Amino acid sequence: MNISIISIGKLKEKYLKQGIAEYLKRLSSYAKVEVIELPDEKAPENLSEAEMLIVKEKEGVRILDKISDDTHVIALAIEGKQKSSEQFAESLDCLATYGKSKIAFVIGGSLGLSTEVMKRSNESLSFSKMTLPHQLMRLVLLEQIYRAFRINRGEPYHK
């Protein structure tokens, strides 16, 4: 299985980089996982609705450029479906069973994802109704992917 995490914005925090590196190392025996960082669109502090839409659209074009036609796309969005770790593990297992070898998780910037990215997504996933920093979501997502592989293989970890 090839998993891509496509994310807007450059990760600056050392502690997040270390956590991400650790989970990428752990995941290497289960799947090929890559994190693709795309530049965020520079924008002033107080944007109008129209300006926010333009920023999301520009970031969306960058995201869509990284997704091939045969990729199953899962958008991380606050309005997405919430799943338990076991349900998430089951859904990853089902994707593999049905021959979906390329999966891309998409994490938008601080303004979220464009309409076009949401249309391209096969499903939408939410980790919480709370707003979380998009940089932190990379680490949380990698941990949950790792947990899912451990659950699916019946290996200890997730309790």
From Swiss-Prot:
The keyword Methyltransferase applies. Coiled coil: none annotated. One of its GO terms (molecular function) is rRNA (pseudouridine-N3-)-methyltransferase activity. Keywords: Cytoplasm, Methyltransferase, rRNA processing, S-adenosyl-L-methionine, Transferase. Gene3D superfamilies: 3.40.1280.10. One of its GO terms (cellular component) is cytoplasm. The keyword Methyltransferase applies. InterPro entries: Alpha/beta_knot_MTases, RlmH-like, tRNA_m1G_MTases_N. It catalyses: pseudouridine(1915) in 23S rRNA + S-adenosyl-L-methionine = N(3)-methylpseudouridine(1915) in 23S rRNA + S-adenosyl-L-homocysteine + H(+). Homodimer. Belongs to the RNA methyltransferase RlmH family. Specifically methylates the pseudouridine at position 1915 (m3Psi1915) in 23S rRNA. This is Ribosomal RNA large subunit methyltransferase H.
